Amino acid sequence: MITALAAAKAYANSGAMSVGSIGSIGGSQDKGVDFGDLLKSAMDGATKASKVAEHKIAAQVAGKAELVDVVTAISSAEASLETVMSIRDQVISAYQEIMRMPI
């Protein structure tokens, strides 16, 4: 279940990773973010959040971190993973829809 905090973080991250313009009628094209780069950025963010959570857990086991920090890091990693899974599901759905189109 996605909490309000996770939704707010996802919204903030989507604004930071917004895709530039695809092109304009006049022929001049602005350099936008490549879709592959956008996916790579989302994956890198999820990986980083997971590593931060792992380090917080290890620090808590050693008695060097607060439990609240550990829970916050785990929640952030979970939200990132849910975002990546949602993106993956949407990409698969779009691919399947394209494959169903008649030639």
Curated annotation (Swiss-Prot):
Its main location: other. InterPro entries: FliE. GO terms for cellular component: bacterial-type flagellum basal body. It is found in: Bacterial flagellum basal body. Keywords: Bacterial flagellum. GO terms for biological process: bacterial-type flagellum-dependent cell motility. One of its GO terms (molecular function) is structural molecule activity. It comes from the Bacteria. Belongs to the FliE family. This is Flagellar hook-basal body complex protein FliE.
